[in-house]
Amino acid sequence: MTLIDTSSWIEALRKDGKEEVRDRVRKLLLNGEAALCDFVLLELWNGARGDYEKKKLAQMEREIFCVSTTSAVWTLARELAIRCRKNGITVPPSDLLIAECAESHH
């Protein structure tokens, strides 16, 4: 299972998206290996414009596995944030959460 990040979904869904990204997402979908998480869905819904995009997102929610964002995932994301900050790196909270969601369901 591969958790696909928001930016990759956006590229894959665009008619003029990068072909390399579109191909990779397409292969994951065809092989039943694509996954979403709640935060990726939130980001996609937040950017959805018009009925077509909303229908597409609703279809994705029905058909693509969504990994759960458990309290353990939130704890891991906080711990990752602390480790990153100790090394002078500031990571957006959304990226920390998505990364730990992927890691915990790998």
Predicted region positions:
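Short, well-structured N-terminal submotif of metal-dependent ribonuclease cores
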Residues: 1-36, 45-59
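Generic structural signal for small/hydrophobic residues in well-ordered secondary structure
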Residues: 5-6, 44, 77, 102
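A general structural signal for well-ordered alpha-helical segments in protein cores
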Residues: 22, 41, 54-57, 74-77, ...
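Active-site-adjacent beta-strand anchor residues
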Residues: 35-38, 47, 67, 92
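Active-site neighborhoods of divalent-metal-dependent phosphate/nucleic-acid chemistry enzymes
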Residues: 64-106
